[in-house]
Amino acid sequence: MKFPMNNKKMTTKKRGQYGELLAADYLTAHGLNIVAKNVYSRYGEIDLIAQDDRVLVFVEVRLRRAQALVSAAESITPEKLRRCYQSAQDYLQKNYAVPPDCRFDAVLITQYQTHHEIEWLKNVIF
């Protein structure tokens, strides 16, 4: 899936898919194994779930244009963190008899006209 960097007509959904693809590629290049994408629960959606050695990583992806009023990091509200945590608990209860060690990361993508910058924040919850 390839999108032009400055396509202002791209839908929010397509932009989100593009951000998740960039994040998945970035995490894979840094040694993580993506095990699930777009996992839904009654609390919300988990963008990516990855394996980092023996740690299961729940990943929130945020993509923002450089001109946006709110940065990618600022767009992750306490309410969003709470929903991510609840969604992760729901996922673990449904998929594991004994939950593995887990952490919550965020991949922040700032989109410029000609390029993008990716920042990976580990352990963003608790």
Swiss-Prot record:
Gene3D superfamilies: 3.40.1350.10. Belongs to the UPF0102 family. PANTHER family: UPF0102 PROTEIN YRAN (PTHR34039:SF1). It holds the Pfam family UPF0102. This is UPF0102 protein DNO_0639. InterPro entries: Restrct_endonuc-II-like (IPR011335), tRNA_endonuc-like_dom_sf (IPR011856), UPF0102_YraN-like (IPR003509). One of its GO terms (molecular function) is nucleic acid binding.
